[in-house]
Amino acid sequence: MNNTALVMNKISQLPVQQRQEIIGLLEELEEAKAKESSRTDFITFVKRMWPSFIAGRHHSIMSDAFERVANGELKRLIINMPPRHTKSEFASYLFPAWFLGRYPEKKIIQTAHTAELAVGFGRKVRNLINQEDFQEVFPGISLSADSKAAGRWNTNKKGDYFAIGVGGAVTGKGADVLIIDDPHSEQEAALGAYNPDVYDKVYEWYTSGPRQRLQPGGAIIIVMTRWSTRDLTGQIIKSATQREGADEWEVIELPAILPSEEPLWPEFWPLDQLQALKAELPVSKWSAQYQQDPTAEEGALIKREWWQEWEYDSPPPCEAIIQSWDTAFLKTQRADYSACTCLLYTSDAADEERG
């Protein structure tokens, strides 16, 4: 018999009143431990605030990253993940509330591709902080008396929350945490299919606006679905690899279907439903939005199954050899190296063309 069983056996032998008092004290102790866990462990907080929450493997990954941001261990985080996988619920609703519960004096700037959406997040966070179950976890934390606007409010400890859409002005605002949630709209992505330059305006706004509003030691969280190699994730990663001293990012990619052919979130998205969705979408959209790979080989002009192998010393007979060079011009540690592609126009290919 283990210690718990021994204790419960002893309690069961006590008079009814004493037994009820002890059980009541034990329940209070368990509740106190649960509240403390909710303050320090993000996923525990999520389950307490959202009892019907269906946990998946990716939620543990996201929670670990958010905890490291809150603890000051991670300053630049990008999470790329598919639609309808609780991206916004975690990053733009539950995390800001939990963070301000822990650090009610901090400042958050929340962005989304429209001001309406960003303000909607602010309203949900504000309402959650006002709820009794939140107050039980973070007693003494509330909104200031004059905090009525959904997208602009303060805590009673002089913390600040400010919500804006992409392109909005952030002059005069500072952020200990900047959260960017899906900065690109579907309409923008549709235009981007024909004119990739449309993605540049988001990157230019990010660098000229929100990025400059970060407090010393502040953190940036970007959660988004991929659309293009020119989207915000793509341009930030490119900058990080090409510019000396640029921000260094931790990038978490969460594809809807894993390399093992298992769904990322089988508890909510069964494989057959994802495969049906894949069959209905253009390859480029599925690869980018659901697999977080806007350069997936399925959408490439040259496909993997076309490649053939031969022994190094015995290449096939060829009619011509073509070389294409991509040279590196930057002399920095992060500069891309020079690369060469050598193409052989083989005799059998020439024979097929001739006849």
Language-model features: locations:
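Signature of the SF2 helicase/ATPase Hel1-core->accessory helical subdomain module
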Residues: 180-256
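Conserved P-loop
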Residues: 80-82, 87-133
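Conserved nucleotide-state-sensing and coupling region of NTP-binding domains
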Residues: 111-170
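ATPase catalytic-site recognition across NTP-hydrolyzing enzymes
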Residues: 261-327
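An active-site-proximal beta-strand-loop segment
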Residues: 325-338
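N-terminal accessory segments
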Residues: 1-75
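Conserved RecA-like ASCE ATPase "motif II neighborhood" in helicase/translocase motors
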Residues: 151-195
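Conserved small/polar residues in nucleotide/adenosyl-binding loops
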Residues: 345-353
